[in-house]
Amino acid sequence: MRLILDTVTFIWAVSAPERLSRAAASALLKSTTVREVSVVSLVEIAVKQARCKLTFSKADVTAGVEDLQLRVLPYSARHAFHLFDLPTHHADPFDRQIIAQALAEDLAVVTPDNAFYLYKGLKVVW
């Protein structure tokens, strides 16, 4: 199974793993799971950290990627073109980009955000 963590899931997995659901934690621990985080999440964390809305540091991100053995998924034009076809179930531009990536790459998204379930064809783990 290939999984992509949304931003809050990545942060929780690193700093507060007890906040993960059992299904999410189990999926992340499976040795056969390919775990990914979007470069979009790294941008979102950097933006929020710069605006003092988050205390998650660059070192936290780097350590989290290493500790969780995550592949950082680049964002491509192919991903961006998926945005044109997405309904607007919610307006968060970072989430929408992660959804577009997940659909383009056939990834399941690990997220506590119920709005993700509204996107047809999107696989969600929580």
Task: Map each language-model feature to its residues.
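Short, well-structured N-terminal submotif of metal-dependent ribonuclease cores
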Residues: 1-37, 51-63, 67, 105, ...
